[in-house]
Regions:
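P-loop NTPase motor domains
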Residues: 1-244
Length: 244
């Protein structure tokens, strides 16, 4: 393989997809001896992973919307063809509302996917009572009073256009999509951040995404990580180094 020899030259920064942890084992120690910071998203041995919290890389509303779109794409099985895109669009609106709300309203320690899952629990729907107001409805009503132009509120209203039974199906579908974030090991990874993606182009570092070769259950995290890593590099080049 040409990957390991290239890395062992230690002449640039690296972002490496590493099935079964073989590349990290062969090159990580060498890079560390040569002054590199090593960051690892480890989906083979979850307990050994560094933290990765996608919320840490949201600078504005556009970033939040990108995160949701990337999450939806990364958690949709490849080759699947929807007969009705309504459900995915409805899930997207709900997730945009919740993630924007946390990004704009919540303290930093609550900006993570564990809190997204908790917020989903507040979105109760009673099929027999279309007038029922859930705890999450009350929260968004309070936000609307303070900030009538809130994009989070607008997206929540899109979700609320659905009737009771349909809303319940949207909630279930969203919760199933995000089910991995209920696992303690994934929660431990995504509740904090060690990746420091904005420094990828600033100092010697290597980022390894260690993935199993026989299970893709959590690979969506790698997709999110790569998308945000490249966004961070573009931001650093354009805004900090002014395109240099």
């Amino acid at each position: 393989s040409y990957v390991k020899p290239n890395i062992l030259e230690a002449n640039t920064n690296y972002v490496v997809t590493d099935p079964k942890q073989e590349v990290l084992t062969a090159t990580g120690g060498w890079l560390k001896q040569n002054g590199y910071e090593i960051r690892v998203l480890n989906l083979v041995n979850l307990e050994q992973s560094d933290g990765y919290n996608p919320f840490r890389y949201l600078r504005d509303e556009k970033d939040a919307l990108k995160l949701v779109n990337n999450l939806i794409q990364a958690t949709t099985p490849k080759g699947s063809h929807e007969s009705d895109p309504f459900w995915t669009k409805a899930e997207t609106a709900l997730l945009q509302a919740i993630i924007l709300m946390l990004f704009q309203e919540a303290p930093e320690y609550e900006q993570n996917f564990s809190m997204v899952m908790r917020v989903l629990e507040y979105a109760e729907v009673k099929e027999e009572d279309e007038e029922y107001i859930s705890p999450l409805d009350l929260l968004f009503q309070a936000i609307e009073q303070d900030r009538p132009d809130s994009v989070a509120v607008r997206q929540y209203k899109v979700f609320k256009m659905a009737a009771g039974k349909t809303s319940k199906s949207i909630l279930v579908s969203t919760a199933v999509r995000l089910a991995p974030f209920n696992l303690p090991q994934i929660k431990a990874i995504t509740d904090h951040d060690d990746m420091d993606l904005y420094t990828l182009g600033e100092k010697k570092c290597a980022l390894y995404a260690v993935i199993p070769d026989n299970d893709t259950s959590f690979n969506f995290l790698v997709s999110l990580l790569y998308a945000q890593a490249f966004q961070a590099l573009y931001y650093s080049a354009d805004q900090i180094h002014h395109g240099a």
